[in-house]
Amino acid sequence: TELLNETESYWGYSNTAYSIGIIISGLIAFRLSEKFLAAKWESILFPLVAMAIVTLTILYFPNAQMFLVFSALVGMLSQLKEVPESVFLQETVEENNLVNVYSVLEVISTLAFSVFVLLMSYITENFGISISFWLSAICLMIEAILIYIRRDYFR
């Protein structure tokens, strides 16, 4: 709200833009499913790098309308990353263990999300929004590097 000079209600628009991005990328993934299957690690790597770039770009264009566009882009990219991740899990985990794996992943994901929201709130409050965005971009790039290093595992 400080960076964009918007009210708290603006974040509802931002969340809506993010959700629209998810819906659009779902349609894209449906249309390009064969390409995702043929290039799993690339289909995970590209959205990670692109999300890091978009995250940093937001800092240099602190404009409320552009932020909505960037929110939609991040929604699209996050969904495009999740589709090949899900396919990878389904192909590598035995069918009778799939429910357990998804359950554990959901618990870990929810717990990690909660902890990182708290941590990033603290960092933003004490060090500023720019540091939070930079940390987010760095984390995305670390994940991208790990995917690249382990790319043979995805074949």
Question: What does each model-identified segment do?
Answer:
Residues 1-155:
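C-terminal transmembrane bundle of multi-pass solute transporters/carriers
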